[in-house]
From Swiss-Prot:
It is an enzyme of class 3 (hydrolase). It catalyses: Release of an N-terminal amino acid, Xaa-|-Yaa- from a peptide, amide or arylamide. Xaa is preferably Ala, but may be most amino acids including Pro (slow action). When a terminal hydrophobic residue is followed by a prolyl residue, the two may be released as an intact Xaa-Pro dipeptide. Monomer. Binds 1 zinc ion per subunit. This is Aminopeptidase N. The keyword Cytoplasm applies. Its cofactor is Zn(2+). Zn(2+) binds at H288, H292, E311. Belongs to the peptidase M1 family.
């Protein structure tokens, strides 16, 4: 049932909010006055978990009804027109990382509490009565009183105006949506700087971190704001930009306007021992949130079905920004590895959501934050659009969009209109097929009787209903003489031999630089030509060959055995991008390999041979002046070499562990997870798991914490695994925000999978209580769908989750997971024998 829009009866203009918060009792006392235009004599405001004692309108007490089911308070004001409605109420701090909530941490063994907020998507209503809809933009006058202690500070969207007897009064905000209001208070350390245009920028964290951990995020934030101001040709709209790392946080980060909050691992960087991947990740997260300060905050989607306007765009711009600020990082390679790969895999399952999807009820909003679709696919579409328009027109169109719609709300067509006005191209016609349709096409390229035939149809992994969908496919080819777009089902280009000669006899390839959202099935001579030139192709094209052949095999269009046969062509590659493509393919092939089998021995040998040259070249030690690509590649090479049971690598890993056993965090970060994993695999020691766990609890280094959790999950000891699982219910050991990651590490390992699955089923009520509404909640649906590969597990999954299909927040994820497991089981059954044979044959030949 569609939820009613409260803005239809009341349009807010200003909120005056006073909150009195006590950390010890976890109680909130609130007084809120909302001024706006009443369009009805009976109006409603969103409210959840708020206990009202008084409501006034037109300066007199008025009747009200609390409707818990619809999360509303209904107020009878008796007339229409401009009115101020005031509320007095009490509430409690939440413990599920939504609304106003506490974060817990320790400094030198002393337990402390920080208070922060998370109001996106519709959780402002848990803090104050509001029209909690993105279209209902208003200004906010915020005042906060709290049980202040020495060393405490408070920050919010706007600068603090004054402090009256412990009441912190903040300047009025600009006009914005309720979900962007934010504040944080507690004992925080910080560093500040300024942009060239005078915007004050600050990085904040608790004092259990090194102060130097703030340097990198502060530098990235300052430079990113400067980049966006220039690129958008639109000034940053606020006087400051605060960046706050919270010990407990449900998402990765949140773009609160001027007061951005982060999970600690997404913002803080160990200045003495951080990987290049960690720096890149933190930098792109910061750039993503800052992109939102314009696209999402200054201009906001009208309703949640256009969430992609926020997230797809910001996900694209984080890479545009970082490519400009740190060109040596080659971040577009990372885009292909992560975003493109994630989108292509998820978007190939029948039933997947489109980028733009109708939202009828707030319970469905959480399902929109599918990172593979709204973020990854959406950003891939923006990359495609930027290439089609050209960067100059793309940037100019954005500047026009911001100028035209600042402090307002939009739908997707408003963006297309601005880009079309600048470029002269019909952007809406080009983009509608991509944004409004689920899935993507496979373009088949073949030569028939000297005619090049290019055709498109929707690509499915597993069963899929072909509904005849067509896309405007940019061919982006390396040849001249071909059309720019494939918009029909098929196009035929005669005279292939002559056309090839005009293009110097080069092999034909499509989708140059992997910038458009489709894959290619090259048939016959076209594939042979590509593979014969593989050493001279661009790295991204080599990666695409591996990417596309892997997906075609996953769909059963070709066999994984065919893919194994092309692996020898990639043994001499030094590129991080290409070797990551190999690594991803190897992970897929592991599905067919039984533990302790002859095939496993042959596969280990094959993997070792594929990475032998890079192992000899890179070794274990970072070299001064080496490229970001080599630094990133080392971990992949070492991991695969150890998988291959390389005696030299295993001995070296053990030596490094022994040299650092008194300070595990001191292992060089780029090899640390490999060393930690190897020691558990080698010793299978329960005592070592205990050491890792004790280290996990004590350290404040979030990247190191994840590495330790990944390592302990490799233990093959049922008693220890049971203890690990039980510890997830102890927040002093594993924070609720980290349960999903820690649990998945156990689920993905064959030895511990049954125990992890049993724990999930037995503790579903606990997960609902702790994580219901949290952005990691549906991971407990999705992760098994990404992992299970047997008919028995499929039956168990259906038995447990099909009764939960009535939950709108989980429905699509459950249906998708069932299809994914079904397809995986069928794939293994149909291809295993051929894949085993090919692995053995190629391993012997290589």
């Amino acid at each position: 049932m569609a939820v009613k829009r409260l803005i239809e009866t009341f349009v807010p203009e200003n909120y005056k909010i006073f909150l009195d918060i006590d950390r010890k009792t976890k109680k909130i006392k609130g007084q809120v006055a909302i001024t706006g235009e009443a369009k009805d004599s009976v109006i409603a405001f969103h409210a959840k978990g708020l206990h009202f004692s008084k409501v006034r309108a037109f300066s007199v007490d008025t009747n009200f009804i609390e409707n818990e089911e619809d999360e509303e308070i209904v107020v009878k004001i008796g007339e229409t027109g401009r009115v101020t409605v005031s509320f007095e109420y009490e509430a409690e701090l939440t413990d599920n990382m939504m609304g106003i909530y506490p974060s817990y941490y320790e400094v030198n063994g002393e337990k402390k509490m920080l208070i922060g907020t998370q109001f996106e998507s519709h959780f402002a209503r848990q803090a104050f009565p509001s029209i909690d809809e993105p279209e209902a933009k208003a200004t906010f006058d915020l005042s906060v009183k709290f049980d202040e202690e020495e060393g405490d500070i408070i920050v919010s969207n706007m600068p603090e105006l004054l402090n009256i007897n412990g009441i912190h009064v903040f300047e009025r905000t600009v006009k914005m949506s309720s979900y962007l209001l934010a504040f944080v208070f507690g004992e925080l350390q910080f560093k500040k700087g300024k942009t060239k245009s005078g915007v004050e920028v600050g990085a904040f964290a608790t004092k259990d971190h090194s102060e130097a951990a703030l340097d990198f995020p502060l530098d990235i934030a300052i430079r990113s704001i400067e980049f966006y101001e220039d690129y958008y040709k639109t000034p940053y709209p606020l006087p400051h930009s605060w960046h706050i790392a919270l010990p407990d946080f449900s998402a990765g980060a949140m773009e609160n306007w001027g007061c951005i909050t982060y999970r600690e691992v997404c913002m803080l960087v160990d200045p003495e021992n951080a990987t290049i991947q960690s720096k890149q990740y933190v930098a792109t997260v910061i750039a993503h949130e800052l992109a939102h300060q314009w696209f999402g905050d200054l201009v906001t989607m009208q309703w949640w079905d256009d969430l992609w306007l926020n997230e797809s765009f910001a996900n694209n711009m984080e890479y545009v920004c970082m490519d400009a600020l740190e060109p040596s990082w080659n971040v577009w390679e990372s885009f292909s590895i992560s975003e493109a790969n994630m989108a292509l895999n998820r978007d190939a399952t029948d039933g997947v959501q489109s980028v733009h999807v109708e939202v009828t009820h707030p319970d469905e909003i959480g399902t929109l934050f599918d990172p593979a679709i709204v973020y990854a696919k959406g950003s891939r579409l923006m990359v495609m659009l930027r290439k089609w328009l050209g960067d100059e027109d793309f940037a100019a169109g954005l500047a026009l969009y911001f100028k035209r719609h600042q402090y307002g709300n939009t739908v997707g067509d408003n963006l297309w209109d601005a880009l079309a006005e600048v470029s002269g191209k019909d952007v809406a016609a080009f983009m509608h097929s991509w944004v409004n349709q689920p899935g993507y096409p496979v373009v088949t390229a073949e030569v028939i009787d000297d005619t090049l035939v290019l055709s498109q149809k929707q690509f499915f992994v597993g069963e899929g209903a072909d509904k005849g969908r067509l896309w405007n496919v940019p061919l982006n080819t390396n040849w001249s003489g071909l059309p720019d777009l494939l918009s029909s089902e098929k196009v035929e280009i005669p005279g292939f031999a002559a056309l090839k000669a005009k293009n110097d006899g080069k092999a034909l390839f499509l989708n140059d630089a992997n910038m458009a959202h489709y894959i290619i099935d090259y048939k016959g001579q076209l594939l042979t030509d590509l593979l014969s030139e593989v050493e001279t192709l661009e790295n991204v094209t080599k990666f695409q060959i591996l990417q596309d052949r892997k997906l075609l095999a996953k769909a059963g269009v070709i066999s994984y055995a065919d893919v194994v046969n092309i692996l020898p062509a990639f043994t001499n590659e030094e590129s991080y991008l290409v070797n990551t493509g190999l690594s991803q393919l190897i992970s897929e092939l592991e599905l067919f390999v039984d533990e302790d089998s002859e095939t496993e021995k042959a596969f280990q040998s094959l993997v070792g041979k594929l990475f032998a040259k890079n192992y000899a070249r890179l070794g274990w030690d970072k070299v001064a002046g080496e490229s970001a690509g080599d630094e990133s590649l080392r971990g992949i090479v070492l991991s695969k070499t150890l998988y291959a049971e390389n005696a030299d690598a295993k001995a070296k890993a053990s030596q490094i562990f022994a040299a650092h056993k008194e300070n595990l965090a001191g292992i060089p970060a780029d090899i640390r997870p490999i060393v930690l994993n190897n020691e558990i695999k080698t010793t299978n020691s329960a005592e070592l798991v205990k050491t890792y766990r004790e280290t996990y609890v004590k350290t404040s280094l979030q990247e190191f914490k994840r590495e330790l959790e990944g390592a302990v999950a490799l233990i093959k000891d049922e008693k220890v695994i049971a203890e690990l699982l039980e510890s997830f219910k102890n927040a002093d050991i594993v924070k609720p925000q980290d349960i999903a990651f820690s649990w998945f590490y156990l689920l993905r390992n064959d030895f511990s999978q049954d125990a992890a699955w049993a724990w999930e089923k037995a503790n579903w009520a606990f997960l609902e209580e702790k994580l219901g509404g949290d952005m990691s909640y549906d991971k407990f649906v999705i992760y098994p769908g990404n992992t299970f590969k047997t008919a028995d597990k499929l039956a168990e999954y259906k038995a447990f989750f099909e009764p939960k299909l009535e939950n709108q927040g989980l429905k699509r994820s459950i249906e998708m997971a069932i299809k994914q497991i079904t397809a995986r089981v069928a794939l293994i059954d149909s291809q295993k024998a051929d894949v085993d044979k090919s692995i053995k044959e190629i391993s012997e030949k290589l």
